[in-house]
Amino acid sequence: MGFRLKVEGQETIELGLDNIQTVIYDTDTPDDSNARSTDVGSTLRISGKIITAVDGDSADDTLKLALWSLVPAEKADSYRKVTLEVIAADQVVRKVHFPNAFVVDYNEHFGDTEGVGAFTLYIKQKKDKTELATIDGGYPV
């Protein structure tokens, strides 16, 4: 199974099968509700490897993710269009699309023995635009 992430804004950020290791999609509603809540949110938590550029290869786009996480809320570019594809056996199992996503948390981890770093990106769809988020899948790549 593999993953492809595309973030579109003033610049395009793309991470692929080599970078992304785990993805968690979550529909978030209040836990203390006794009926279906209108307070619904959608989130993605994406984790993977930071790949170092070697032998003239270009660096991966994790640096661009880190820079996106620093964009202040006052700027329109803090919200971007995000598409995540989950791929298995040449099938798109899931395609999650957030047209107005923003970064909640971004972390990078480095150690002196691992050889590469790791990242975790936690994004949400803007709550007043949750109905614009889409999930589909079950078709060839």
Regions picked out by a protein language model, each given a short descriptive name:
Residues M1-V141:
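Glycine-rich, low-complexity intrinsically disordered segments
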